[in-house]
Regions:
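Leucine-rich tandem repeat or coiled-coil scaffolds
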Residues: 1-97
Length: 97
């Protein structure tokens, strides 16, 4: 599913994550270049708990802060996932470093 550059904010990402919970065949989710902040990114990342076929998740070029990156990695560390590709490249995060 390609949702790149649709100006989706965190609230929209949360609704999307809730809507996709039953879509267990989802393999690719591209949400690059939206306006998603940490809370929305965490909701999307938690899809990995129920989507064992998700292979690629792109959350790059959003507004995910340092805590969000740590949270995403924590979810990945605690789930039994098959994710092969994760993009969390973030210009906001780069300015913090």
């Amino acid at each position: 599913m390609n949702l790149q550059g649709n100006k989706i904010k965190s609230e929209g990402a949360q609704y999307l994550a809730e809507s996709l919970r039953d879509c267990t065949g989802l393999q690719y989710l591209n949400m690059r270049g939206n306006k998603i902040k940490t809370n929305g990114a965490m909701m999307v990342t938690e899809l990995l708990f129920t989507h064992d076929k998700l292979l690629s998740l792109n959350l790059g070029d959003n507004k995910i802060d340092h805590d969000g990156v740590i949270g995403i990695l924590s979810v990945l560390n605690s789930s039994n996932y098959t994710l092969e590709e994760l993009n969390i490249d973030n210009p906001v995060y780069k300015t913090i470093c």
